Amino acid sequence: MTAPIWLTAADTALIGDRLCALGWLAPDEALTDVASAGDGNLNLVLRVFAIGRSAILKQARPWVEKYPTIAAPVERSAVEASFYQLVRAAPALRTFMPQLLGVDPAWHLLLMEDLGEQADAAALYHRASTDAAARTQLIAFLAGLHALDLPLAALPDNRAMLELNHAHIFTLPFAGADSDLAATAARLGQRYLLGAGPLLHGDFFPGAWVYGDDGVKVIDPEFCLFGPPEFDLGVMAAHLIVSGDPPEAPDHLGAAYQSAGGGAVDSALIRRFAGIELWRRLFGVAPLPVVLDHRRKDALIALAAGLIRA
């Protein structure tokens, strides 16, 4: 097994050689171009082109792509690959995600189906929430995902990634919060760290939703974990609020989830996780991709605190 080389978009020849060595390119086939495939937060994400086809190449490097000073375990690539394989095995879910075409454990590479040049759903932040059809599809995806009956061994060990996420969601953003709020966040963080419950996407926000010709797709399950379904729902609800939904979005989302066949959920816990997501996007290292004036930011801070204490 060769040691990994940490790639960049400029490494066309090296990437071509690696894809040929893996059998992902035919011997008489060559790459014609390599380009960035968007602003990846966690991983290097490239679009690779050969004659008549393209694919997405992801590499987990030993740091967070957007924040290179933050170390991150490269084993997350194997965990993400397992998530895609589990979803692919579920007929009701496989159409929601791009197909995993190849896995290179030595260089921590994933080769993915290219969904095309569609943008993610970040435009939602600049208009009034999701359209009804997309929202229905996203809720159906979560209900189906959480219904999978899987043993914990279905995913490779993800403890290091879980602890990194925990720090940046439940601990570091609350360094300047009042003690009661920080203590509540810490208790919720312990629920997250337990690793008990159904399989979760782990970062179910507009950056992971891609609109295509055949409906909305879900990508980037890099933070997947076993945990409370209310966590996925709370993250989704927080971003729906930012994109125009009322503060009652967590309750509405929980009801819609159960109507879609999802299991029973705790509405208060959805509210608390929604508050956590809002707070960490306001005070953590991964801010919302919107410009907030002081009035709007103060309103979201107050709402987040109220939801966490709900």
Q: What residue ranges belong to the model's regions?
A:
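Active-site catalytic-loop/activation-segment of kinase and kinase-like phosphoryl-transfer enzymes
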Residues: 1-11, 147-191, 283
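Active-site activation/catalytic loop segments of kinase-like enzymes and analogous catalytic loops
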Residues: 82, 230-262, 274-293
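Juxta-kinase regulatory segment immediately upstream of eukaryotic protein kinase catalytic domains
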Residues: 1-33
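Active-site Asp-x-Gly
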Residues: 67-72, 76, 199, 212-252
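ATP-binding pocket architecture of kinase catalytic cores
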Residues: 46-152
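Structural element of the ATP-grasp superfamily
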Residues: 19, 83-87, 112, 257, ...
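Short secondary-structure junctions
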Residues: 22-30, 91-96, 261-264
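Active-site acidic catalytic loop and adjacent metal/ATP-binding pocket
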Residues: 35-57, 188-231
